[in-house]
Regions:
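Short beta-strand-centered aromatic/proline hotspots
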Residues: 14-24
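Intrinsically disordered, low-complexity, charged/polar segments
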Residues: 31, 36-58
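Short acidic/glycine-enriched loop/turn segments that link adjacent beta-strands
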Residues: 26-28
């Protein structure tokens, strides 16, 4: 599990801040909720699988 407050990079090189964790009600899949700081979705919130995320700083 990636800690809330961690700075992450996705597989495209975009950077985001982890703000929460979320488990899908029906599938039970775990997601990391982030606020994008760079890239195409700056300022937006997104729920991501952790597979393609790299922790830059905790």
């Amino acid at each position: 599990m990636i800690e809330i407050g961690s700075l992450i990079r996705d597989s495209y090189g975009d950077i985001a801040l982890v703000t929460d964790h979320w488990i899908h009600d029906q599938s039970g899949e775990y997601h990391t909720v982030v606020k994008w700081l760079s890239g195409r979705y700056v300022g937006e919130t997104d729920a991501l699988y952790t597979d393609n995320l790299e922790v830059i700083a905790c």
